[in-house]
Amino acid sequence: MGVTELGKLIPDNLRRRVSLEQLNGKLIALDAYNALYQFLASIRQPDGTPLMDSQGRVTSHLSGLLYRTINLLEYGIKPVYVFDGKPPELKLIEIEKRRRVREKAVEDWIKAVEEGKKSEARKYAQRALFITSDMVDEAKRLLDSMGVPWVQAPSEGEAQAAYMASKGIVWAAGSQDYDSFLFGAPRLVRNLTISGRRKLPGRDEYVEVTPELIELNDVLKALRLRDRGQLIDLAILLGTDYNPEGIPGIGPQRALRLIQEYGSLDKLMNTVLKNAQFPVDPFKIREFFLNPPVTQEVNVKFKEPNEDEVVRLLVEEHDFSQDRVKNALERLRKSMGKAKGSTTLDSFFG
């Protein structure tokens, strides 16, 4: 997911490097599916096979969710995971395309494993990622037992996270994708990892990263755009999840100049782009970004962990090491009190 071309237009000086310590006490809405995909991609065996329990059920997502969440809490960061709901019809073509890519990757992965090509097998395995409904249910169950809030979006999770940030329910949206700005998030935190490095998509390589904070108003000012509507029109020219190809032949700089000069996609389509082909109605895309389905009433309150339930899910049902889970629970217990200016659980549960 994401509008990567748009990111190329955001100046480096707007990407404020922040430490995890500086995010102490901040409530941040995290893209749950983005996080789960990250765990499935990175927590794997040498041949690309994910971690599994004795019954062959994937557990990489649970391991990643447990330890990443605890790491964030230890820095006093309050994560609220937002799960995708029903995808919009605008996205169905792209979803089908991704499904075919995954199916081909599965075939290539199996072949590479059979031929003993571990590096290739791992590469294809990462492309073959998919999240099942069982994985999502288990992730929600783990968060519930840890006392960490999550929100079910009616449609796009990033739209829900952006809404929560725009209303002050959370301090920022946390995602790798710039879609958050198109949906109206005033503040975006990227690279919210603990290890200090991030895996390159489809490659067995890592790059050093630090969290970065970007503000929507700064982006609009730097790009000399009037409002979010113009930013959305710019993104549509470059390509979004709903029209991934954008307009052929129009790169980031030209797209920006066109929006600055003509002011809107409407005027462009009546002039220089009157012969352009749009597989998906661009005005429907714009309307979806401006008014996506969201849940207005959400509960982001933290609760006391149910340690017995964590043990039941991870140790008894999925064969996690009891000692490791016990150690993780001790860290969870201590980290729940780490909020700015307080060492009590009230700082999280209030």
Swiss-Prot record:
Mg(2+) 1 binds at residues 31, 84, 156, 158. Keywords: DNA damage, DNA repair, DNA replication, Endonuclease, Exonuclease, Hydrolase, Magnesium, Metal-binding, Nuclease. SMART domains: HhH2, XPGI, XPGN. Disulfide bonds: none annotated. Its cofactor is Mg(2+). Residues 1-102 are annotated as: N-domain. Residues 120-263 are annotated as: I-domain. It comes from the Archaea. One of its GO terms (molecular function) is 5'-flap endonuclease activity. Mg(2+) 2 binds at residues 177, 179, 241. Binds 2 magnesium ions per subunit. They probably participate in the reaction catalyzed by the enzyme. May bind an additional third magnesium ion after substrate binding. It is an enzyme of class 3 (hydrolase). Its EC number is 3.1.-.-. InterPro entries: 5-3_exonuclease_C_sf, Flap_endonuc, Flap_endonuc_arc, HhH2, PIN-like_dom_sf, XPG-I_dom, XPG/Rad2, XPG_CS. PROSITE patterns: XPG_1. GO terms for biological process: DNA repair; DNA replication, removal of RNA primer. NCBIfam families: fen_arch. PANTHER family: FLAP ENDONUCLEASE 1, FLAP ENDONUCLEASE FAMILY MEMBER. Interacts with PCNA. PCNA stimulates the nuclease activity without altering cleavage specificity. Belongs to the XPG/RAD2 endonuclease family. FEN1 subfamily. Structure-specific nuclease with 5'-flap endonuclease and 5'-3' exonuclease activities involved in DNA replication and repair. During DNA replication, cleaves the 5'-overhanging flap structure that is generated by displacement synthesis when DNA polymerase encounters the 5'-end of a downstream Okazaki fragment. Binds the unpaired 3'-DNA end and kinks the DNA to facilitate 5' cleavage specificity. Cleaves one nucleotide into the double-stranded DNA from the junction in flap DNA, leaving a nick for ligation. Also involved in the base excision repair (BER) pathway. This is Flap endonuclease 1. The gene is fen.
